[in-house]
Amino acid sequence: MSKQQPLERLAAADVITSLRSELEQTHSNPADVEREMRTRIEALHWEIFNQTQAEVTKRWTYEQGIKRPYYHVTELDEEQLTNWGKYLDSEEAEGDYERTKFLYERCLVTAANYDEIWFRYARWLASQNGKHEEVRNVYQRASCIYIPIAKPAIRLYYANFEESQGRFDVAVAIHEAILMHIPSHLETIRSLVNLHRRQYGVDAAIDILRKFTEDANCTPQTRGALVAEWARILWRSRDDSTGARKLFESTQNQFLDSQPFWSSWLLFEIDQPSNQSEESTAHERIKAVHQLIRHKSTLAPELVKILSSQYTRYLEERGGKDAMSELLKLDAELNGPASIQNAVKA
């Protein structure tokens, strides 16, 4: 049927012009020129067909796995999410930016409620040169439309992105928006504190910590963890281990049931650098904190055992000549029969 069609309907004008110009240099008969042009155009269409068929075949397995190509609030099953992941892997391996981006957008029609897809899309775009606005657009769509604020991880990454672009005020505003809805979200508060530390200095970070440790909207567990973070910044950023220790000591009565507080205090003392001559003093400090955990804190027995295991590890790895005696006595008190444990409590 194509043999009966005019050449102008078989190929684009620029293709016809190029072929005609080439063939007229080697063929003097117009009929020969047209016959050869038709042969080459047919070969061109056959090549396009084969390429298209090959591309379709590569993707057909993944396309068959797409059972729900539209948006719905109900969850996708794990099989479909896995299929989308493999499909994206395959398309990324091809290296075609436009095709890969188009597939991500198709995937989001179905899986817009899954922050892992938005994370993947943003990270892939960030790996492309000069795509900062596209990355920002992805984070904004995820944060403002699809992912509920009760799942703040994507918003925190959005804040990190804006900070990396020098928009510190926007990054701060994103954190504050999260905390308006989730006042005690520890990860967000820590992220905000470290943002201030990086951009405005240690004093600014401590001001944020002080604000939230005094905030009645924060739970005791969160405030205990923030005091531990405060001590960590004093030690790590100011090299003020004495100030950090005083902070722990002065606030201990407020956080008797805060596992992050006691765990951080114990690890703080264990991690203090000391030489052989100072190890005895360090041991006494570590032992004192451990005794507070066992006899003063109101932590659950299971948590006390976990923290005690850190102390026994310290005794084993850094303890002195009498460390094994103390370790075995402590092990019996913590893990021995009820008669021993009850005697210790009495």
Please name every model-derived segment.
Residues 1-346:
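Polyampholytic low-complexity alpha-helical segments
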